[in-house]
Amino acid sequence: MTKVIIEVKSLQNNDLIGKVVLSNRGRDKGHLYVVIGHLSDNYVILSNGSTKTVQMPKQKNLKHINVLDDVDDEIKASIISKDRGTDLKIKRF
């Protein structure tokens, strides 16, 4: 687990956008999310397309997530361009 935390902190904030993450702490433990932004060095903004939409995202501490290798370029482009269909794309992913 420490390895993942170090890896997450070493990534640039823009590198995290579009990455799929797994929550490993809290009520949402085991849920998958897509990183749609960052608040600070320790917090990211997450969305799953259904319960946590782009308009009402979840904020989560970097220590409480595991970053998976999955990233979809279409979703990343949609997040960056603030496309209206982003929630649907995230939900289908």
Named regions from a protein language model:
Residues 2-17, 24-25, 34-93:
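Ferredoxin-like alpha/beta domains used as RNA- or RNAP-binding modules
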Residues 29-31:
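Short N-terminal binding/cap micro-motifs at the start of the first secondary-structure element
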